[in-house]
Amino acid sequence: MAKKLLLGDEAIALGAIHAGLSGVYAYPGTPSTEITEFIQGNAIARERGLHSRWSTNEKTAMEAALGMSFMGKRALVCMKHVGLNVCADPFVNSGMTGVNGGVVVLVADDPSMHSSQDEQDSRFYGKFALIPTFEPSNQQEAYDMMEVAYAYSERIKLPVLMRVTTRMAHSRAVVEVKDEPSQENTLNYDAIAANWVLLPANARKRNDFVTAQQAQLEEDAVSSQYNKYVEGTDKKLGILASGIGYNYVMECFPTGSPYTILKVSQYPLPKQFVRRLMDECQEVLIVEEGQPFIEDMVRGVGDPKNVHGKLDGTLPRTGELNPDIVKKALGMESGECFDPCADVAPRPPALCQGCGHRDVYTALNEVLKEFNNPRVFGDIGCYTLGFLPPFRAIHSCVDMGASITMAKGAADAGQWPAVAIIGDSTFTHSGMTGLLDAINENADITVIISDNLTTGMTGGQDSAGTNKFEAICRGLGLSDEHLKVVVPLPKNMPEITQIIRDEINYHGTSVIIPRRECMQTLQRHLKQKKAAEKK
């Protein structure tokens, strides 16, 4: 066994490769992005020709993974928590179809919303879809679980959801890894068509089958190597800890816990262990990262007055946990903390100097001064920072692709002018259908597709629509007369402002594409070019 220092994301990626992975499908989103990037750069993955291209969105990623599974091979789907909303349709239905080759759906939740718009807990999706969920407590488990999850997926013929959180994904630890990776599955034709064609007659049978499996899945959770019941000597308190929450608990007891601890890293919740904990201990503390998912269920098993956690305020309901927070919940004193930020001047996030989005907002703000009550609907990406000073340019940002459809809805309500601003990667992710709606109804909106030739905010991944946006807009039915392309530079400001002014005054759907490469990827490409010239 070799030892490697790995991020949680890297441990997951390497675990998948060593488990005989044939393809990863993903849309970049913090904190899950590094999984796919690691696979793309891994020597074994390259040698084997593993599929590792970015997908257009999470839904297409999930469906492609199901196609690979249909042919008997092992697939990995990666996304951040809100991406699971996007692929909910195929994800939930994958519980009905089942799998042929193993499928692991890796979802990275973001408590404290470091780079997200909500704190949703993906474990609810696993329960809703009736599929098992794994939640590693450390990087070693994250690596080891991948092989276990694929074997389990193929044994029970269901996909497996694996849930991690930001701190697990982006912290490093030494991980023992296998010397030799497992071989990939061979192509096979064992998939039963009746399971995969979800006509009502077939789906009813599959629904009965999956529902009947739940008792076995719970038995498997009780016998899982990742769920442990460690009896303590002090029965005043029992602790149920899940995922990384277990690590935080153990940090509070470096020489061992006097209390009984139930560690949960595989779901459905092992109720047999929970009942034992409730029977043996006077009080129970639930330590879980995210929503009170387990706590809600445990309160239905015993006297809720004896259950403590997020619902009674023992632990904070929002934000990340950490060892100090858990110590406080246990009534223990935590050491004094050094505040590294006490003397540091605040530096809020801002668009990079030289960024093309800056020039777009400068021009847009200049033009919108000429109108009464303009509204600008923003989207997810670097350009969302246009909400902050000095631009203060956008009035909404809800979810991927919402800018165009919200602008259309506002125009339907009588708002004018209604402007949508969306990035290139977000447009192909989920903006095209909204533009089609607008074009079909000739909605009175102006759409700005701010194209920086990359998926910038998550690190400069390839953008699916690069060099295709004009063709896409024409294909959706937009006329060339109201499809404009500009280069966002200060020297072009008179031209850009006039085009924005003209298209706002046109009463119909128009699209403006300001196109200039992201400054970060431009600098990276220049460095690569210089390095290549020196060779």
Describe the function of each predicted region:
Residues M1-D9, A19, P136-L351, G356-H357, ...:
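Flexible, low-complexity linker and terminal segments
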Residues M1-Q139, R167, G232, P258, F387-V511, E517-A532, ...:
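Thiamine diphosphate
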Residues Q40-A45, M250-I261, A471-D480:
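Short helix-loop-beta junction
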